[in-house]
Amino acid sequence: MKFIVKPHPEIFVKSESVRKRFTKILECNIRNIVKSRTESVAVFNRRDHIEVTSESNEYHAEVLEILTHTPGIHHVLEVKQSEFKDLHDIYEQVLELSRPLIENKTFVVRAKRRGKHDFTSIELERYVGGGLNQAVESARVKLHNPDVTVKVEVSGDKLNQVLARHKGLGGFPLGTQEDVLSLISGGFDSGVSSYLHIKRGSKVHYCFFNLGGPAHEIGVKQVSHYLWNKYGSSAKVRFISVDFEPVVAEILEKVDDGQMGVILKRMFMRAAGMIAEKFKIEALVTGEALGQVSSQTLTNLRHIDNVTDTLILRPLINWDKEDIINLAREIGTEDFAKTMPEYCGVISKKPTVKAVKEKLEAEEAKFDFSILEKVVYEARQMDIRDIAKESEQAAPEVEQVQAVEEHAVVLDIRSPDEEDDNPLEIAGVDVKHIPFYKLGTQFGDLDQSKTYLLYCDRGVMSRLQALYLQEQGFNNVKVYRP
């Protein structure tokens, strides 16, 4: 197994020292993730690319998944590496691999060469291309826009034949930019805005203002852990939860109805600014888009920004909602957002779209700011890697089983795409598929006389969902970890 990783082109327009630093960070990020999930996989920095190799193909799919979801990578080449004797030997090896690919098609050979050889790259292309054209009668050479491009790389005495090219995330390696604090609600917008900053190279910490109790917090932890695990697991980041119900209660009691929405957002920013300062985080990230709701007019956003000196970043400010949802679907957060409760929009019946500074300040003068200081002081912070451990500790009564007991039903709670890619089939066992985001509404319709074993690939989602179901009063659930 061998992959050639090409860093994002923006890295190579940097100065030599910055380029070296960025590629070194990318190398370390890849190595850290690969070592945490696989064995016997080596990572090498080759200046203009990074090689990931193993003697075995056991972790092929796992490594490819890691590389295509790691920030800073433009594309990944999947290659077959072998030794060669001479130019004709190269041709014979390429013919063996490429014959079925070019039959009844047009093709071109593109070659790259490093090291000392008795042939040039152009001579290599002509020799191999001419040989393929003669050996495969139904194939035809076409230099521009062919059906198939046969890619060959020669480095020293090694021949690399490109089997496939996979698109990377792009952006910058994680950790090359300064840290940010994402105000995450679990909805479409905050998940996408967090992803965009991960992709751009920032370590994204998560701050959740809890307005909806334990069930809401569990859901937000799930999407935060998913984003970290899928795109940023090379970094150590924090998840911070702030119980904002006392603040909301004070606003509902003291503040004029029309000003509630903007003042709540101002309280969010004040609290987040204090947390960012405590942890030396340079900027806040929100999922706000211009005009999407009443608090997101330019006037209101300016009043919201003015309560903190911390930089506020809004990567979605000019995005349409449809585009946000499409990207959420692409990165895998759509299913979380679909069932995430939304609380912020319900506290003001007639919200202002053009707040006045003096009126906001007059309403806030009624507010007891010691409540805000108290909830920030009592905020709970944890290493995001401990979310899975917390789910175990928070629900020790959730039993894990390795074998399916008699009459039990296995519930595959993975997303439809994951289930399609690797269906769960167990001989003699009733396996049902209910995606995790539908469990809350569909589990109660199942036969409650039976025991249900929740299954996901890593066991994190199944434990969190089991905790959620038990909070709803269902005690017939266990976690299936074969």
Curated annotation (Swiss-Prot):
Q: What does this protein do?
A: Catalyzes the ATP-dependent transfer of a sulfur to tRNA to produce 4-thiouridine in position 8 of tRNAs, which functions as a near-UV photosensor. Also catalyzes the transfer of sulfur to the sulfur carrier protein ThiS, forming ThiS-thiocarboxylate. This is a step in the synthesis of thiazole, in the thiamine biosynthesis pathway. The sulfur is donated as persulfide by IscS.
The record's listing under NCBIfam families reads: ThiI_C_thiazole, tRNA uracil 4-sulfurtransferase ThiI
Name the catalytic site residues: 456
Q: What subcellular compartments does it reside in?
A: Cytoplasm
Question: Which intervals hold domain Rhodanese?
Answer: 404-482
State which gene encodes it. thiI
Q: What is its EC number?
A: 2.8.1.4
Q: Which HAMAP family match?
A: ThiI
- What family is reported? Belongs to the ThiI family.
Q: Name one Pfam family in it.
A: ThiI_fer
Q: Where do the THUMP domain residues begin and end? A: 61-165
Q: Superkingdom of the source?
A: Bacteria
- Judged by the first EC level, this protein's enzyme class is transferase
Q: What is this protein called?
A: tRNA sulfurtransferase
Principal location: cytoplasm
Q: What molecular function does GO assign, one term? A: ATP binding
- Biological process annotations from GO: thiamine biosynthetic process; thiamine diphosphate biosynthetic process; thiazole biosynthetic process; tRNA 4-thiouridine biosynthesis
Give the disulfide map: 344-456
InterPro entries per the UniProt record, alphabetical: Rhodanese-like_dom, Rhodanese-like_dom_sf, Rossmann-like_a/b/a_fold, ThiI_AANH, ThiI_fer, ThiI_N, THII_Thiazole_biosynth_dom, THUMP_dom
**Which residues does the annotation say bind ATP?**
183-184, 265, 287, 296
Q: In which pathway does it act?
A: Cofactor biosynthesis; thiamine diphosphate biosynthesis
Q: Which UniProt keywords apply?
A: ATP-binding, Cytoplasm, Disulfide bond, Nucleotide-binding, Redox-active center, RNA-binding, Thiamine biosynthesis, Transferase, tRNA-binding
Q: Which reaction does it catalyse?
A: [ThiI sulfur-carrier protein]-S-sulfanyl-L-cysteine + a uridine in tRNA + 2 reduced [2Fe-2S]-[ferredoxin] + ATP + H(+) = [ThiI sulfur-carrier protein]-L-cysteine + a 4-thiouridine in tRNA + 2 oxidized [2Fe-2S]-[ferredoxin] + AMP + diphosphate; [ThiS sulfur-carrier protein]-C-terminal Gly-Gly-AMP + S-sulfanyl-L-cysteinyl-[cysteine desulfurase] + AH2 = [ThiS sulfur-carrier protein]-C-terminal-Gly-aminoethanethioate + L-cysteinyl-[cysteine desulfurase] + A + AMP + 2 H(+)
Give a GO cellular-component term: cytosol
